Amino acid sequence: MSQAVKKYYDDHATQEWERLDNIRCKIEFASTLHLIEKYFPKQGRICDIGGGPGRYTIELARRGYQATLLDISEEEIKLAGSRLDELGLQAEFIVGDACHLNQFALGLFDAALLMGPMYHVIDSQDRHRILIQLKGILKPNGIAIIAYLNSWGLIRTGIVDFPHWYKEKSKLSSLLYELTFEGQALSDFTECYWSTPEAALQEIQKAGFKVISYAGAEGFAGGLRPLLEKLSTEDPEAYTNVVQFAAETCELKQYRDSTDHLHFVVQSPV
C-alpha cells in the first residue's frame, strides 16, 4: 500500500475514529455489525485487516472473539490500543500492510474483516494477491467480509458530496465504471480505487472464494445525507429506526448495488 495512504491515515486517525459516529456512517457501522452477527462463527480468532482505530476490533472483543487488528497506520494502531485499554478489552495490534498477509500462519483465523484495503490498492494484481493471501490465512470454510467503494452508489452520493464533478458530462458518465485516483487526485481523501458490483464479484471469485451474500452498507438510505441529518434532528426515534432497518435489509438486491460501500460475505474453500 502506498505511502500516500499511510500518511493520510496517520494524519486523520481521530477523524477516522469519529467517522462511524456521523449521521450517514452510523448506517454503514450498523450494517457491518449485522453481517458479523449473521455470518461469523460465534467464537474464534478474527483478523481485522485495515481496521484503522479499531471500531470493529472493539466490537469483536466485546463479543468474546480473539481479535487481531492489522493496520498500516501507526497512529491508528496507537489510538486503537488506547481505546481498548479504556474499555478494559484485549486484542493483538500489528502495524503492517494488508499486501503482506503472508506474515500470518496458514489457516490461523476463523474469520476476517477486510474493510478498507481493497479500495486503497490501485493495482488489480496487488488486490488479487491480497485476496489469495487472505484465503490462505483463513481456516477451511472460514468467513470474511470484504469491502469495496462502489461507483454506482457514489454517482448518487456525489450530487451532494462532489456536485462540481457534474459540470462535465464525461466525469458523470465515468461513474458507471471502475475508477482509480492516484496520489492527491481527490483533494479531501487519499489514493483509492472505486469498483462496481460486477467487477468486485469477478475479482473475488477469481481468487477462489465462494460468495455467500453481499450487501450495500448504506442500504435504502444511500445518498440521502441531508435528509438523514434533518431526520436525526427533527425526529431522532425515526432516524434510529431508519438506521436499524437499513442495516437489517442491507442485503436486498434492490438496494445493494447503489450504495457507497459494497460488503461481500465470502467463504474460503475446504
Regions found by a protein language model. Name each.
Residues 1-52, 55, 59, 144-174:
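Conserved class I S-adenosyl-L-methionine
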Residues 55-100:
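Class I SAM-dependent methyltransferase SAM/SAH-binding core
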Residues 103-112:
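A short acidic, Gly/Pro-enriched loop at the edge of an enzyme's catalytic core
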Residues 128-140:
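A short glycine-rich, Lys/Arg-flanked "PGG" loop and its adjoining helix->strand segment in the class I
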Residues 191-208, 214:
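Short alpha-helix
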Residues 207-270:
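C-terminal lobe and adjacent flexible extensions of AdoMet/dcAdoMet transferase-like proteins
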